[in-house]
Amino acid sequence: MMNNLSHLESDYSEYVEVDPTGRYGRYNEVLGKGSSKTVYRGFDEYQGIEVAWNQVKLYDFLQSPQELERLYCEIHLLKTLKHKSIMKFYASWVDTDNRNINFVTEMFTSGTLRQYRLKHKRVNIRAVKNWCRQILRGLNYLHTHDPPVIHRDLKCDNIFINGNQGEVKIGDLGLAACLQHSHAAHCVGTPEFMAPEVYKEEYNQLVDIYSFGMCVLEMVTFDYPYSECSHPAQIYKRVISGKKPDGLDKVKDPEVRGFIEKCLATVSLRLSACELLDDHFLCIDESDMRRVESEKGLIDEAGTPLRHSYHIPHYSNGYYSLYNQNQWDYNGDETVESHEIDLLEFQNDDDEEEEDKRFGSVDISIKGKRRDNGDGLFLRLKTVNKEGCVRNIYFPFDIETDTAISVAREMVEELEMDDRDVTKIANMIDGEIASLVPNWSIFCSSESNRSSVGSVMDFNEMQCGRDGCEEKHGRFEEITFEITVNDSDEED
């Protein structure tokens, strides 16, 4: 017994770090860990409560006063949100010496709603309704905020729970955006939970309702939506074509399914959080003792999902949303790593006016991710012209054998692009890879003769229609679609 007490005393008697005010102390116990964020157990001496001490490595994200100002604006937003269904945000500060940003939030005893649901599989429908009401109250608060706030990455991994009280709260607001105008204009989030209008980068707060519907689907099936898909491009294709996830067919209860379908309706028919709170499905029925039932999902014998969600956080000129690293849990052990897709965005601003004259009204951006095995990258080049034609080009990049210039030349040749685009594309590829691979040197590798290193999408033939076309050109796989005036009208 004394040995056990001594062990606890050594763990908790000394802080390893204290905040500038002296109020919060950090212990060395890791609650969870992502690629850039580590969560430690902390203590609030004023209130006498345990807290979550979140530490984000900034690396090169803070490169200018503008980016720092933007980061502070986000922190200010999080501090101003006060609601019982929103995670409490206590304090934050920048550690310039160690290039960290630290922020303190409330700590949840049971981790995320997804973890909690996988742990407790036998749940009455009343519990699910209770969770839904709490989440919708939080969304209604965000959406009626002045200005309205869109979460943009709502999923069960970002909803936290204190299981001993049944208290559910929305967290991880790093992708949240204040809606200063009628629409937002960045494609961010997790593909399985993203509404069709998000892919067209013009949307409002109703995208959170769509994501909420997918959360309810996940609650009752244990699966991520679109678990039948193997990568984001397949999900994208199904979403923009209006095809619902196969998991919806597993929902046996017609009342539950009907409620989910209301959330997943087209934006013109989709209800607000306030309207959904008045829905008959969420009415309290003391006599309703049904268990949540669905066909068996993609879960192994240990209760672990067989596929993790993908994630598309938004970066802009090096700015990093501080809550982005979502895949961690309060377990004190090694965190289960998810198959996240970390996408970054690089925009080359040199000689912007001269480039605009040559490229006209074409907007070009590039994003990338590391491959799961760590020995290569996947990149996506996106172009949008003044007519609203969007062209997404996916391709692998081998950091050992490829160079930016060789791949750019190959792309221009395979896709019959303007030869003058080679240098611009190569520069953008180099810039993006430099942000993904810290030791990357521009033009450091010999030119590659490889035509294909892997595949992003499995298309057996070209398929064209109203929602887009897909083609394969060597290593390059292309999706194109048009944003028309009629499309925009439908989503208003």
UniProtKB/Swiss-Prot annotation:
| A GO MF term | protein serine kinase activity
Catalysed reaction, written as an equation? L-seryl-[protein] + ATP = O-phospho-L-seryl-[protein] + ADP + H(+); L-threonyl-[protein] + ATP = O-phospho-L-threonyl-[protein] + ADP + H(+)
In terms of superkingdom, the source organism counts as Eukaryota
What Gene Ontology biological process does one annotation of this record name? protein phosphorylation
- Please provide the record's keywords in A-Z order: ATP-binding, Kinase, Nucleotide-binding, Serine/threonine-protein kinase, Transferase
Q: Which residues bind ATP?
A: T105, E106, M107, F108, K155
Offer one Pfam family short name for this entry. Pkinase
State the function annotated in the UniProt record: May regulate flowering time by modulating the photoperiod pathway.
Q: Which family does it belong to?
A: Belongs to the protein kinase superfamily. Ser/Thr protein kinase family. WNK subfamily.
Can you name this protein?
Probable serine/threonine-protein kinase WNK9
Q: Which organism is it from?
A: Arabidopsis thaliana (Mouse-ear cress)
Q: Gene name? A: WNK9
